[in-house]
A protein has these predicted regions:
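Short acidic-hydrophobic, aromatic-tinged amphipathic segments that line or gate anion-handling sites
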Residues: 2-10
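A short acidic, often aromatic-flanked loop/helix-cap motif at beta-alpha or helix-coil junctions
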Residues: 9-13, 94-97, 154-159
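N-terminal catalytic cores of NTP/NDP-binding nucleotidyl/phosphoryl-transfer enzymes
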Residues: 9-71
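Short beta-strands and strand-loop turn motifs
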Residues: 21-23, 53-54, 87-91, 116-121, ...
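Residue-level signal for inorganic ion chemistry
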Residues: 29, 79, 117, 178, ...
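N-terminal Rossmann-like or analogous alpha/beta NTP/dinucleotide-binding catalytic cores
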Residues: 59-143
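Glycine-rich, Lys/Arg-enriched anion-binding loops that position phosphate/diphosphate groups
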Residues: 140-238
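Phosphate/ribose-recognition catalytic cores of enzymes acting on nucleotide-derived substrates
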Residues: 194-305
Length: 305
């Protein structure tokens, strides 16, 4: 898969006709994968290229929600798994004031050489989100033709699968539910210096900060897994303000990696979240905290058996 930054791409970067998958693809959940799959299949059917068109950050929603499920790097990795030929990355501010017709001719027909597209039933484009999937289909039909595949709504139980639903689940600590939606929550960040209090207690931990663009999960303790090089280790992660040992109010991640001993400061580690265990507690002593962590470790080991 080739990655194209639309700010710097050459005018003939995509020289053959293409089928463009349209969406923010934040979290790349099962509904997004349907859109990407349809673009891939239509492109293969017509012997041309498939393109995923997306943004380098999550556009601000009307409710002010901007927390991303995936960073741009995580999004690229997920889209690559779908077999797409190109991912075209744009900046939302550069196109947000284009009319639907301007977006169609400048971006789709012009830059991306699109003869077809794939989108979800609720896809919006044009200034003020003034046009939707049906208007996109009409623009193709009225301007030389081209197929537009519109994916239906996907529901699980009473819930519509969407990035908004997934962000809500993350903030409620329901990270285990994300797997049934075709996505997950993880944090990839550098290991920074902590106060070494846990290490002095015989429970070494790594400290990380959640990237500012990411949605922050419910504060508390989680069963997690750490990727270190080619190896994966079960772990227990606390997301929060460390109420027993600190009161500066700064949210961070502190992870005890089970079965690992090594120097990780300065390295970037991915922590995958699997299950919420409990909220933050203020323990009466460090010994009581130690006992609770040992209990959480046992739960983590049992979870991955």
């Amino acid at each position: 898969m080739r990655i194209i930054n639309l700010k710097t791409m050459a005018s003939d970067e995509i020289s053959c006709p293409s089928v463009v998958a349209l969406g923010t693809f934040d979290g790349c959940h099962m509904a997004h994968k349907e859109v990407l799959k349809n673009a891939f299949l239509l492109a293969r059917k017509n012997g041309t290229a498939s393109v995923a068109y997306t943004f380098d950050s999550v556009p601000k929603a009307k409710n002010g929600d901007t927390g991303a499920i995936y960073t741009i790097e995580e999004k690229i990795k997920a889209i690559k798994k779908m077999g797409i030929d190109y991912i075209a990355i744009d900046t939302f501010d550069d196109v947000k004031n284009l009319s639907p017709e301007e977006f169609f001719f400048k971006v789709l027909r012009g830059t991306l050489n699109a003869f077809g597209a794939s989108c979800g039933y609720n896809y919006k484009f044009g200034k003020g989100a003034s046009a939707g999937a049906n208007e996109l289909k009409e623009l193709f039909l009225e301007n030389g033709g081209g197929s537009v595949v519109i994916s239906d709504k996907i529901t699980l139980g009473e819930n519509t699968v969407s990035s908004t639903l997934i962000r809500d689940l993350i903030r409620e600590g329901e990270v285990e539910a994300l797997f049934s939606l075709g996505t997950n929550y993880s944090v990839y960040a550098p290991v920074v210096e902590g106060k070494h209090l846990a290490t002095k207690m015989g429970l070494p931990t790594i400290n990380q900060y959640i990237p500012k663009e990411k949605a922050v999960p419910k504060l508390g303790v989680y069963i997690t897994e750490c990727e270190i090089g080619e190896d994966v280790y079960p772990s227990v992660t606390n997301v929060g303000v460390r109420p027993t040992t600190d009161n500066n109010g700064e949210v961070n991640m502190e992870t005890h990696i089970i079965g690992y001993r090594g120097y990780l400061y300065g390295s970037s580690i991915r922590v995958n979240f699997y299950k919420y265990l409990r909220g933050e507690k203020k323990f009466s002593s460090k010994e009581e905290l130690f006992e609770e962590i040992e209990k959480n470790k046992e739960e983590a080991v049992k979870y991955f058996k």
